[in-house]
Amino acid sequence: MKLMVLDGNSLVNRAFFGIKLLTTKDGRYTNAIYGFQNILLNLLAAHKPDAVAIAWDERAPTFRHTAYDGYKATRHGMPEELAQQMPVLKELLTDLGFVQVSKAGWEADDILGTLAAACEAAGGTTLLATGDRDSLQLVDDATTVLLATNKETIPMDPAAIREKYGIEPPQLIDVKSLMGDASDNIPGVPGIGEKTALALISKFGSLQGVYDNIDDKAVKPGQRAKLTANRDKADLSYMLGTIRKDAPIETDPAAYLRQPGDPAAAAQLLAALEMHKLVDRWGLNGGTAPAPSENAAPLETVEPSPLPLLPEGRFYAARNADGDWYLVQGQDVYLPDTDRLAAILDSGAELWAFDAKPLYRLALEHGGIGSALRFDGKLAAYLLNPSASGYEVHSLAAEYGVHAAFACEAAPDAGVLAGLCDTLAAALDESGQRKLLDEMELPLARVLADMERIGFAIDADGIRAFGDSLRSELDGILNNIYTTVGYSFNVNSPKQLGEALFDKLGLPPRKKNARGYSTDAETLESLRPYNQVIDEILKYRTYAKLLSTYVDGLLNAEAADGRVHSTFIQTEARTGRISSTEPNLQNIPIRTELGSRLRGYFVAGAGETLVDADYSQIELRILAHITGDEHMQQAFLNGADIHRSTTAKIYHIPENEVTPQLRSASKAINFGIMYGKGAYSLSKDLGIPVKEADTFLKTYLDTFPKVDGYMKDCIAHAKDKGYVETLFGRRRALPELASSNFQVRASGERMARNTPIQGTAADIIKLAMVHVWQRLRDEKLQARLLLQVHDELIVEAPEEEIDEVKRILKEEMENVVHYSVPLTTEVGVGKTWLEAH
């Protein structure tokens, strides 16, 4: 038998701290529950164990605490946000049929050791899943540790232990007895680190062997003195660090076979936690709708009916598991073919859909506009809870308590679809967000469908040539790196790069973290003054990213018509921003000369020209309006340079005396204030001391008290209401503000400050897209809206329509709302995106 034992506490902590704080719309924390399930599902898929045990620590002291008062004394308590999730997670695991085990006075590690020994004695093998290296001492021919790291799970068998540490797995206990363990407050021998401990145990075999050979010349005098003076601590540490294999628990591996559990209860709980995708991953689709009462009559089963020749009234539309659309009216279910469905989309009927964008695209491809579409349940669910992990009919029905009106094998969700859409509509009305759906999100779905259909032409030959030049440059960069280091290695490997920089070249800092040397961008930037190879490495990363993500990505995405057809997503960003994928056109780089060249390969079609309109400083204009600051408003009304004007106001100097350095500082603060940046972040942006940045910030807030007051009011309002709103009424819940964790709470405060501004900017560009798209159609132009990126719209137009399109873009974008500060746009024209922008 193959038994998998999970170190529950280790993995749930990794899940909690590895995923941003998530909550349900009623404020329950869920990130640890969500992350733990993903870890478990991935382990099950990868290793397919016969039985699974999940081991937990008890909150009571253990025999180790009795032996040593200081054991784990330096650890902080469990965060309240995690503690609230633990009973829910354990209930869910029980409903899913997993056997959980814990024992007062013993640790989860001892349960892992006991079950591994018992399984081996029974002739089986054991997989121990943990993020804690303590369990590596248990590795043998029948026991493998699946060590969870930030990026991957690494199988550690005896050979892997020997390769990494140069000793046998049980000898890791001896190593810990010498070096100690700060995380568990195991003392070890003061002054003996990991490197020395490994060398001594490798030489003498064990802790006892070290002391038996204390006078050996291999033991340096300083080490000898430390070892001799601290023998008692070494022995204590050996006891504390040894995982026991005799915990009084059930040791028959068969006792940990997965149980039937309660699938319906699991599905209900997952739905209540708004983990819709996990309902599917656990295979619980059949049990998610609320169970009818015991006395309820059995559901009537209906078969699909022929669609009436002239459909009238309201229909509800969604896709079944095969991707086929079905319609529901009363207790009638219809499965129309594509042509019939397209005809209905522009008929006199009324259609309430769940995910309208594909239907809009179908209508557009058939020469219509989808005029029958009046509601989108998926978009409604997103507006009600933009933080949800997914939006599926069956899960939302369970979440909102919608019971099936009938059963239909061809469309299992058909019985709840109408009730769900009606319930979501009522909830949307109650929240005051129905106007957002009717006038912004639903019309925008049509616009996005059209943009997906049209696509954006690319110069594939130019991209290939650009890729070839990047590869050539990369070869030269790698040669420069290898020459400086003195040997070739995998520059993409953080481990090998760290060894090259810090061990071979001796660059500071020499400090390691748990995964080895840090080689992230921030670390490399700090090393620039020490060796020119750092510039080459940073350049390598830039070129490699351009090549793999953008050059190869765009060429792979090119369709037969020579265009890339991105998919635009409305239900992903919590701020209301649109995102795109396959390919992601929102992140085409523009900040570097090399990256911006990519825009030169997005081209207008034959006989066409690109017209690009970009809002000018839209977020600062919203800030000026929303705070009511007279100086900022006047600067925009006068068409002044807002950053120069701000600087002059702060320092009481004429604008013509503002230096570039002072203007840069004010610009950083103008934008940084919206993102909740403090002195430390500003100091990094400006390359100045923290104290100087703090002075800039305080002077700014003293000069613009209405800005300071607005930011404080945002936080107070969000704490009181539990959410923030854009000027259009879009809501975003902020449970982070109630967190006991300072960093999480500070993050919530930053979101409270910037969401109304960022979210309002997102709403404005969305509404502008709807207006521009409709205006182009109303004026019967051939011009087509191709793309939205942040505050920028790109239209493809025939040469003879350029002036008209420029006028439409300016009129619609600048007049989409009327605030105390005017919105302005900059419009450009060109054959490529680079030329037009």
Which residues does each predicted region cover?
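Conserved RNase H-like, two-metal-ion catalytic cores of nucleic-acid enzymes
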Residues: 3-4, 8-53, 69-70, 74-81, ...
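Short hydrophobic beta-strand that contains or immediately precedes a catalytic carboxylate
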Residues: 5-6, 128-130, 374-375, 491, ...
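Extended two-metal-dependent nuclease catalytic cores across DNA- and RNA-processing enzymes
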Residues: 22-23, 73-249
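Active-site-proximal helix-loop-helix substrate-binding element of RNase H-like nuclease domains
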Residues: 152-176, 183, 323-448, 472, ...
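Conserved "right-hand" nucleotidyltransferase catalytic core of DNA-directed polymerases
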Residues: 226, 230-339, 347-356, 413-593, ...
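Function-dense linear segments that define catalytic or interfacial modules
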Residues: 360, 366, 374, 378-407, ...
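Conserved catalytic core of nucleic-acid polymerases
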Residues: 453, 561, 565-566, 570-573, ...
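C-terminal polymerase-core module
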Residues: 472-479, 483-534, 702-750, 754-756, ...
